[in-house]
Each structure stands twice: as C-alpha cells, then as structure tokens.
Curated annotation (Swiss-Prot):
Homodimer. The gene is leuB. This is 3-isopropylmalate dehydrogenase. Its main location: cytoplasm. PANTHER family: D-MALATE DEHYDROGENASE [DECARBOXYLATING] (PTHR43275:SF1). InterPro entries: ICDH/IPMDH (IPR050501), IsoPropMal-DH-like_dom (IPR024084), LeuB_actb (IPR023698). The keyword Glycoprotein does not apply. Its cofactor is Mg(2+); Mn(2+). It comes from Bifidobacterium longum (strain NCC 2705).
Length: 343
C-alpha cells in the first residue's frame, strides 16, 4: 500500500492560483501507485494581507510544519510595499523551517531560445546557502536621516552552516556530472572566503570521485554567459547565490521553465518548492500563465521525497512538450493537459 504524504499548498496570489493545481495533478499522476498525497491549503499572500493584515499567523505556521513538503505558487502584489511579504512570509518560513539549501536547477530545453548566441549544452544547478550570510538580518542603522547616518549589514557565516550546505552540494554532484564549483570572493572577503574554501577542501576529500574548483563571483558571472556548459554544481553563499540564480534563469530562456526548492535536508521540517516566476497580476485570471515551472517544482518535490523515477516522468514529459509545442501559444489549461498526457 502506497504511503500518504501530507503536502501544504500555498497558491498565493495572481497566477499562483492558476498554476499550482497543475503541479498537484502532475504529482498525483507521476506518483500513481507509489505514493498518495493529502493536501492542506493555506490562504497566505498579498490578498490575505490586504484583507485582514495577516502574513503568517503562528497557528498556521505550526500546521505547515506538520506537513511533509510545501508547494508554493507565487506571492506578491504591487499594492504592497516591497519587503513586507518577502520577509514576513517567505523568509520567515525559510528561517523558521531551517531551509538552509536554496536549490535552483538551470537547464536549456530543446525548443527554448537562449539569449546567448552559442549557449551549448546548459544543465547545471546552483546550491545556495539559504539561512546565513548577509540575509540573516544582522545589522542596523543609527542617526537615521542625518548627515552622520551609519548603516551596517553583517554577513554571518558559521562552520556548521557552511559544512552542511557543502555536503549537500557534493552529495548532489555524485548524482550528476561529479563536479562542484565554489563561487565566492575570497581575495577580498578573506575571513568567510577562507572558511568556505577550507570546508570545501575537507569535505571534498570524502568524495574522491567529485572534482572541485573555485571561481571569484565576478568571473563566475562572466562564465555563466560565455561558457555556461562548464558548470555542473555551483556552490555559493546567500548573496552571491541570489545574483547567480537570477542570471542562470536568464541564460536558459527566462523564468517560464525554472523551478526552485528551499530545502531542509535533515527532514526536520518540510521543504518548499515553487516556480521562480512572480504572481504576474497583469495576466492573472486570464488562463494565459505557463504552468510548466510549477509542474517542474512538483518534480523537485518528488525527488526530495525519494521518488526519482516518478520525477523523471515529469521531466521527460516536460522536455517532450517544450521541444514539440514550446513555441506555440496555449492556455494555462492546455499546457497542463498536454504535459499530463505525455506522462
């Protein structure tokens, strides 16, 4: 008898509500016979905030924690000041659920046009540390709005936090092309950079089959557009990862075919999977949004739960659909139906 997994579903705002159901349908079809899913929907996002001022009520967060994984659609609304939902919902979940790996695959599918003249075979993944660095909220400001104002942002890197994400990267590389590239700026950020390098060297000794090298962040951004096929697993910190993942999305043709995961690799808390596109309020409710990225986020969820064969069904169906029909104009529902029909 197949095990039942509990999935927290946060459709969010805009097109998130339209694409998330297709991720759920893909989950169910791909895992048919090997896993069952029980969903709990959460009304969180811009619409909820505008309605009653709630961002992430404590009782709802506790219910989310009781699930095996989280599917997120998209969150955002131009009526809300930037940073409110990002910090109050997305970052709060990431930190409270200790989702210390931000995983962003980047693959150029046949049928998708890259902005690069000669992109080559692009298929790499960025492993970004997700709970430390400059995004952990350390810092402050004094004498605001005066000529003497001082503002600081403090980057915090711990050996514990770095080592666990380094180990994740090497384990992932063993399933791929067995190469890890550390990206940092250790010639300037000498304290953090040195610690990252030493830990990579130490962990690398435990994985003799995996080669590893190093690039400064500025060099890496150049190689991402001049020779992206050289990369397999890119390992980096929170800030540099934020920059590289956006660039990575652009070289494979944009956000329409890209998903990401915020991973708690210890499984102490649920991990969260989502398309990287936004809520796109300009096309919301018009059945125009492409659900492919949301469906790919379902594949990442299956991989995280250990159902690699089921995830492969989704990947194979998506690749075939994009190659044959990716350039055609289709509705949200038609794209979803076409992909599911190939599974």
């Amino acid at each position: 008898m197949a095990k039942t997994y509990k999935i927290a579903v946060i459709p969010g705002d805009g097109i998130g509500k339209e694409v998330t159901p297709w991720a759920q349908k893909a989950l169910e079809k791909a895992a048919e016979g090997v896993a069952d899913f029980e969903y709990e929907n959460f009304d969180l996002g811009a619409e909820r905030y505008l309605r009653d001022g709630a961002i992430l009520p404590e009782d709802e967060e506790e219910r989310i924690k009781a699930n095996d994984a989280i599917l997120l659609g998209a969150v955002g609304d131009p009526r809300i000041k930037a940073g409110i939902l990002e910090r109050g919902l997305l970052l709060k979940l990431r930190f409270d659920l200790d989702q210390y790996v931000n995983l962003r695959p980047s693959k150029l599918y046949k049928g998708v046009t890259s902005p690069l003249a000669n992109p080559g075979d692009i298929d790499f993944v960025v492993v970004r540390e997700g709970t430390e660095g400059l995004y952990c909220g350390a810092g402050g400001a004094v004498r605001r709005n005066t000529p003497q104002e001082v503002a600081t942002e403090v980057s915090i890197n711990t050996a514990y936090g770095v080592e666990r994400v380094v180990r994740y990267a090497f384990k992932l590389a063993m399933k791929r092309k067995k190469h890890v590239t550390l990206v940092h700026k250790k010639n300037v950020l000498v304290n953090a950079g040195d610690m990252w390098q030493r830990i990579v060297d130490k962990v690398g000794e435990e994985y003799p089959e995996v080669t590893h090298d190093y690039q400064h962040i500025d060099a890496a951004t150049i190689f991402l557009v001049s020779d992206p096929s050289r990369f397999d697993v890119i390992l980096t910190d929170n800030l540099f990862g934020d920059i590289l993942t956006d660039e990575a999305g652009s070289v494979v043709g944009g956000v329409g075919y890209s998903a990401s995961g915020c991973i708690n690799a210890s499984d102490e808390f649920p991990s969260m999977f989502e398309p990287i596109h936004g809520s796109a309020p300009d096309i919301a409710g018009q059945n125009k949004a492409n659900p492919t990225a949301a469906i790919l986020s379902a594949a990442m969820l299956l991989e995280h739960l250990g159902f690699d064969d089921a995830a492969k069904k989704i990947h194979t169906a998506v690749e075939a659909d994009i190659e044959e029909l990716g350039s055609t104009v289709r509705s949200t529902d038609q794209v979803g139906k076409d992909i599911l029909a190939r599974m």
